[in-house]
Each structure stands twice: as C-alpha cells, then as structure tokens.
C-alpha cells in the first residue's frame, strides 16, 4: 500500500489468528478476554447455574409451555425474568439448550451475566457477606478459565478420541460437572494461570529442596527407602544435590530431598518458612532436569521427560473448589501404608482383577512440620499443610504399547461444536453404543459395588480420579488413584490395623449407600445419560436399564451378600438429595471437615431413584429378560 511517499506492507490474518496477534500487541491484556469469548463463557455458566441450582432446589423455574418433549421455563426474579428451554431427565436434571437462554428486564433483553445472576440469587443462596466476595471472585475466575478454553481449545471430539493422554488432559474444558465455581484458583495471577493451569499445557520444572530429617516425616512402601526412590526419580541430580549440600558444609545424610510446586516455593515457602531457611533446615537445591505437565487435579504432575517415573503430587496453597489445596504432613506419615493395605485387599480378591480394576499406589510421601504453626494451632488448618508431597505410580507401566489413556472425566467432555467425546469414542471403538456402555459399567460400576458390599470400602470415584485404559477406543481396564486421602471404610465390621485407622468412618446407616447413589449416579451418570441419549442410539431409559442389569448381574454372582443387598437397596424408590453447591456456599474455604465428613453436608429432600423402575425384577437375577422385546 502506498501512503504518500511511504510504502506499507500489509498482511491479512484470520479471525482465529487475532487473539495471538492481540496478545503480542498488548502483553498485559489476556488475549482471551474479548467480547465474544466472555459472552460465550457467561452463557455457558448461566446455563450451568440454572441447571445445578434447579437440581439442588435453590431455584424453582416454572414451565409455561411444553412441546415435543421440550419444556419451556421461566424463572422470575426481583428485577428480571429468565427464559430457557430444556429436556427433563432422570435425577431432576435439566438438559438446557444454551441458545434458548435469555433474560428480560423491563421488557428489554439483557446480556447474560453469571455474576449478576449470582447476586440476584444472593438471598436464596444463603451465603454470608463474609464469604460472598470470595465466591464471586471464584465465579469470575471460572469465567476467565472458560474464556481461555474457548479461545485456545478447539480440538474436535473426534480428534481427541484418538489423541494421547496429555493432549486429552489439557483439552478438557469443564472441570467438576456439579460445582458452579469449579475453577476458582484463588492465589494465581495472570502469569501463574498461563504457567500452572492444566488447560495451558505448559511444560515446567519442579523446585527441589533439602529438608532436615528431624523436622520431616518420610514414609514409603515396604522395601523402598528414600535414597532408592530419589535416585530413580532424580537420576544424576541426586548426586549433584548431595554434592551441593556438602559444598555448603552440610551432611547430606541429615536431609531428605523434596519436590515443591514452583508457585508454592515462590509464594509461600520462601517467605512463610523464612526462619527454617535461615537456620539451614530447608535448603534450596534447584529445579528438576525432568520436565512435567500439570494434570487436571492442578497439583499433580506427570513426568514428560520420563513418563514411566512417578506422578508427583505437591501441596499448593490456592483456594480451589472449597479447599485450600495443601497436603498434611500427618497424613503423609501413613499414606503409603494405607495404599499398601488397600492394594493388598484389591489384589487378594480375584474379582477386581477379572473386572480390570487396578490401584495406582502412592508409594512414598514426605511432609515438613512447621513447628510454630503446629504448636500454635490445635485445629485443622491450611497453615499446617503447606510443605508436603507424595509419589504415585505412573499409569504408563500398566498399559500395553497399543493402548491409550484418558481420565473418566473425558467421558463428559463436549467440544465447541457440542459434539461429545463419548460418542466419538464409541464410534472409534467399532462397538455398538450398548456394548460399549456394558463394558464400561463392568470396569467402573461393578468393582465399586464389590468394594462397597464385600468390604464396606468406598473410593472417591469422580471422573478425574479414574483413568480409563483404552484399546482402539474400547475400555479394557480402569486405574483408580488418590487413595490416601479419599478412601474410607464405612461402619466396618472388622477392626483395621493401627496404621490405617484413618480410613475408618462412622456414619448413619441410611447415609452409607449415598456413596454409590450420590457419587456415581448423581455426579456421573446424571450427565452421562443425556449425552448417550442425544448423541448415540442408547436412550436414557436404555442406559438405566443397563445400569440395573449390571447391578443384578453383580448380585447374582455374589448371593452370599444377599443380606447386604437387602439392607442397602440400590433399587429403593428414592434417596436423599445431597447438594454439593449448597455445601460450597455454606463454607467455600473448607467444604468438608475430613475429621467429620457428614457434618457439613446439605440436603434438599428426596430424589427419585432411576433404578426403582427395575425393583420388580426377580431377586438377584439379570433384568435382561425383562428388557427383551416380545417376539
């Protein structure tokens, strides 16, 4: 282009390229904070608020019209009215059409604004003025994260279905399906987000420190000691770190080596543990030679340089989804022993192996005791959980060369074109949707039922805690993780060994089955069924029939547990509606007291059990005959 006496060279660019160019031109303004992404993020979160708060009876939208199986709702608030269309599914789940949502005030449609909706619902939420600002900050952070994903994650579901493990990890867009404020990450700044958020897929190095043994708890599986583990994990750096200590005049055998999250070192340890550093009880060693990628759980890392090496999980003192994400040194002292006990139980019962159910053991753990906080504070506190880490088995040694991995959370993933990864995975497998679901239930539900009925043992079976092993898209094995903090034995009839006493949980008998009905049915299957219904040939009714069939088949295989099947009836008419968002709204600093897990629970009446329709099937038999069409 000629401009008077000057000549300018112009290069056209596409809309997709604009965020990158904008970021380069304005490095202090996140490129994803653009109107179209922000509006889309708000529409997404408003949809989720309407869905989940209706499910938890916080709001009660009214049907004003019905047509072709679709309900048209209105929600009248003080200064505005929301309108939307949705299909009503089992477990009081509204599958809302995002494009149908609109809000009207004084006869004028207004932009959808998740923050505004939360404020309009403030009285119904019952949140204190002390906690509300932090919750609003978490909502904003969740919107920020969603806008980033909209701008940077456009991998089609069909591509993800064939992708490698870490591409899928970074490609997830939702987080926990129930919680509204599920990407709070209070403590991260803009640069931290790009460096440490799972969706950024950044490659990073861990900080390594030496911690004096008499201030630290180290525990490991039998036959594994600190030096053997760290030589395996650090390689030549182990010797380099020992030499560094010697050069400082320190005896290397007086210290353990500990990995630390880079953010945690910079923001917490270097300052809060300044006295320990000054006294030489904590010594900075340097960064890892190996490179890592953060996982969906945000404080766990997979080793990219050597994927066969351990996962590393570190304390991270950010507020995220109802907890400060620390790790307790007290818990670290017995975590490997708990893992060994659970693994021995699982491996001694052939049923688990037959179903393809495997434990990823936490093989070692370490925690530094800050004596001032431990002396000053008698109650549980995030200040006593700032400097701990653990090593967990990598999933890679558990798979064959042709097999792939993805967390079970991926089964709920929907891409920007509303295409479900689950549907793409079924297509890739070559199986019918019904056969795929049956195999999945055998891997996932059957072992969890067996743990519950045979051993009173429960896991935390949400999507991020389970890793599916796939062979050309076919589920063949399932890997359960996060054992030390999440496993419990409920009202167990047998005494537990002293080192695993922490697993014992006493609760009201009628609440025990909630670990299946809430954690699996309400928090996983409630979302899975509509995806199958909309994007595969398995209808919602057929899905729940397959679940019922799985339960009956399990019962038929274990008639000696008949008394327990009767006592904990999975086919009962209804179960208590446990409200996870209400729990977070009650205390978004610490949702659950691990010393008393039931204390902070919130309920809203009963919810109809989808399996109740199959109660009339003959005892402990398969429901297959009932479901077969008449000839």
Curated annotation (Swiss-Prot):
The way its activity is modulated is described as:
Requires Mg(2+) for activity.
**What is the top-level taxon of the source organism?**
Bacteria
Which keywords belong to this entry? Answer: ATP-binding, Ligase, Magnesium, Nucleotide-binding
Provide the family line: Belongs to the IucA/IucC family.
Q: Which residues form a coiled coil?
A: none
Q: Coding gene?
A: pubC
What general EC class does the enzyme of this chain belong to?
Answer: ligase
Give GO BP annotations, semicolon-separated: siderophore biosynthetic process
Q: What does this protein do?
A: Ligase involved in the biosynthesis of the siderophore putrebactin. Catalyzes the ATP-dependent head-to-tail dimerization of N-hydroxy-N-succinyl-putrescine (HSP) to give pre-putrebactin and subsequent macrocyclization of pre-putrebactin to give putrebactin.
Q: Which reaction does it catalyse?
A: 2 N-(3-carboxypropanoyl)-N-hydroxyputrescine + 2 ATP = putrebactin + 2 AMP + 2 diphosphate + 2 H(+); 2 N-(3-carboxypropanoyl)-N-hydroxyputrescine + ATP = pre-putrebactin + AMP + diphosphate + H(+); pre-putrebactin + ATP = putrebactin + AMP + diphosphate + H(+)
User: Which pathway does this chain act in?
Assistant: Siderophore biosynthesis
Q: What is this protein called?
A: Putrebactin synthase
Its assembly, as annotated, is: Homodimer.
Which PANTHER family does the UniProt record give? L-2,3-DIAMINOPROPANOATE--CITRATE LIGASE (PTHR34384), STAPHYLOFERRIN B SYNTHASE (PTHR34384:SF6)
User: What GO MF terms are annotated?
Assistant: acid-amino acid ligase activity; ATP binding
Q: What's the EC number here?
A: 6.3.2.63
């Amino acid at each position: 282009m000629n401009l008077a006496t000057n000549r300018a060279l112009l290069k056209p660019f596409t809309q997709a390229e604009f965020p990158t160019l904008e970021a380069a031109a304005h490095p202090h303004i996140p490129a994803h904070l653009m109107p179209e992404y922000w509006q889309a993020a708000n529409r997404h979160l408003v949809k989720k608020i309407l869905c989940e708060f209706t499910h938890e009876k916080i709001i009660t939208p009214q049907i004003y019209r019905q047509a072709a199986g679709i309900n048209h709702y209105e929600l009248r608030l003080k200064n505005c009215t929301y309108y939307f269309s949705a299909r009503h599914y089992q477990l009081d789940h509204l599958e809302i059409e995002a494009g149908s949502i609109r809000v009207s005030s004084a006869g004028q449609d207004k932009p959808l604004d998740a923050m505004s909706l939360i404020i309009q619902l403030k009285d119904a939420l019952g949140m204190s003025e002390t906690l509300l600002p932090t919750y609003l900050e978490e909502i904003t952070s969740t919107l920020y994260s969603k806008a980033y994903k909209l701008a940077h994650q456009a991998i089609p579901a069909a591509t993800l279905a064939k992708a490698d493990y870490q591409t899928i990890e970074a490609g997830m867009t939702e987080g926990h399906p129930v919680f509204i404020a599920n990407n709070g990450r209070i403590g991260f700044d803009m640069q931290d987000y790009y460096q440490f958020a799972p969706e950024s897929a950044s490659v990073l190095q861990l900080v390594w420190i030496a911690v004096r043994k008499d201030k630290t708890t180290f525990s490991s599986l039998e036959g594994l000691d600190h030096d053997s583990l760290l030589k395996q994990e650090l390689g030549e750096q182990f010797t380099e770190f020992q030499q560094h200590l010697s050069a400082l005049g320190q005896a290397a055998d007086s210290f353990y080596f500990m990995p630390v999250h880079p953010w945690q070192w910079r923001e917490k340890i270097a300052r809060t543990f300044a006295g320990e550093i000054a006294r030489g009880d904590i010594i900075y060693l340097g960064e890892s030679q190996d490179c890592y990628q953060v996982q969906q759980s945000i404080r766990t890392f997979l080793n990219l340089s050597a994927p066969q090496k351990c996962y590393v999980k570190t304390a991270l003192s950010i507020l995220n989804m109802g907890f400060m994400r620390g790790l307790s040194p007290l818990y670290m002292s017995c975590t490997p022993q708990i893992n060994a006990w659970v693994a021995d139980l699982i491996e001694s019962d052939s049923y688990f192996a037959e179903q393809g159910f495997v434990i990823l053991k936490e093989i070692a753990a370490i925690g530094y005791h800050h004596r001032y906080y431990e002396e000053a504070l008698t109650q549980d506190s995030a200040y006593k959980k700032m400097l701990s880490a653990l090593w967990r088995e990598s999933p890679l040694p558990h798979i064959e060369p042709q097999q792939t991995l993805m967390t079970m959370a991926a089964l709920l993933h929907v891409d920007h074109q509303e295409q479900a990864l689950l549907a793409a995975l079924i297509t890739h497998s070559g199986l019918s949707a019904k056969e795929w679901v049956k195999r999945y239930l055998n891997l996932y539900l059957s072992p969890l039922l067996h743990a519950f009925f045979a051993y009173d043992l429960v896991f935390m079976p949400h999507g991020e805690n389970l890793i599916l092993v796939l062979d050309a898209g076919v589920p063949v094995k399932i890997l359960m993780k996060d054992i030390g903090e999440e496993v419990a034995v409920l009202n167990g009839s047998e005494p537990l060994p002293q080192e695993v006493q922490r697993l014992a949980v006493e609760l009201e008998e009628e609440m025990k089955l909630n670990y299946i009905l809430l954690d699996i049915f309400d928090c996983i299957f409630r979302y899975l069924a509509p995806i199958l219904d909309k994007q595969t040939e398995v209808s919602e009714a057929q899905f729940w029939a397959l679940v019922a069939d799985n339960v009956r088949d399990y019962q038929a295989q274990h008639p000696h547990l008949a008394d327990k099947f009767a006592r904990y009836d999975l086919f009962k008419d209804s179960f208590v509606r446990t409200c996870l968002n209400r729990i977070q709204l009650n205390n978004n600093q610490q949702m659950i007291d691990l010393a008393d897990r039931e204390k902070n629970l919130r309920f809203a009446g009963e919810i109809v059990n989808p399996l109740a329709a199959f109660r009339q099937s003959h005892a402990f038999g398969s429901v297959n005959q009932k479901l077969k069409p008449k000839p």
